[in-house]
C-alpha cells in the first residue's frame, strides 16, 4: 500500500519520461484521471486510456516527445509533488503560483474540481497545490 498514490503516479511518469518510454501504466482513481486529463489538455502527454481490470482499473498514459524516434526531446522537463500527506500546501486566490514564469503549470484541487493555476486564476479560486509541471 502506498502512502501517497499521487506521488507514485508522478514518479512513474517522471521515470518513463527519463527512460523515453512510449507508455506507462498507473493504478486508476478519479483524481488521477483528472490529473491525466489536465496533462493531456496542456500538451504534456499524448493521450491516456482507462483499462478496466476487474479491480480499480489502470490508466495507461501515452508519453509525448518532440523530434524523431531517434532524436527524441522530452516535453516534460520536470515534475515536482508540492502538497504531501505529511504537509499540505494550500494557496488563496491571490497567491496562486506561477511555474517557471508561466512556462509550466501548477495543478490544484479546488472546490471547483482539479484545475491548472491559469484556470483557478480566471475563476478566482484557491486550493491545494498538488504538483508543478514544466
Curated annotation (Swiss-Prot):
Pfam families in the record: Ribosomal_S8
One of the GO biological process terms: translation
Keywords: Ribonucleoprotein, Ribosomal protein, RNA-binding, rRNA-binding
Entry's Gene Ontology cellular component terms: ribonucleoprotein complex; ribosome
Quaternary state and interactors: Part of the 30S ribosomal subunit. Contacts proteins S5 and S12.
Record-given protein name: Small ribosomal subunit protein uS8
HAMAP family noted in UniProt: Ribosomal_uS8_B
Any one GO MF annotation of this record: rRNA binding
Function: One of the primary rRNA binding proteins, it binds directly to 16S rRNA central domain where it helps coordinate assembly of the platform of the 30S subunit.
Family note: Belongs to the universal ribosomal protein uS8 family.
Amino acid at each position: 500500500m502506498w502512502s501517497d498514490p499521487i506521488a507514485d503516479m508522478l514518479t512513474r511518469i517522471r521515470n518513463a519520461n527519463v527512460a523515453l518510454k512510449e507508455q506507462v501504466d498507473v493504478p486508476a482513481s478519479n483524481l488521477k484521471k483528472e490529473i491525466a486529463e489536465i496533462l493531456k489538455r496542456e500538451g504534456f502527454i499524448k493521450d491516456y486510456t482507462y483499462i478496466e481490470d476487474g479491480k480499480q482499473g489502470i490508466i495507461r498514459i501515452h508519453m509525448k516527445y518532440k523530434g524523431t524516434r531517434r532524436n527524441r526531446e522530452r516535453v516534460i522537463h520536470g515534475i515536482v509533488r508540492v502538497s504531501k500527506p505529511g504537509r499540505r500546501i494550500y494557496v488563496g486566490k491571490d497567491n496562486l503560483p506561477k511555474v517557471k514564469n508561466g512556462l509550466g503549470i501548477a495543478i490544484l484541487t479546488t472546490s471547483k474540481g482539479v484545475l491548472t493555476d491559469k484556470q483557478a486564476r480566471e475563476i478566482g479560486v484557491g486550493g491545494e497545490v498538488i504538483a508543478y509541471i514544466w
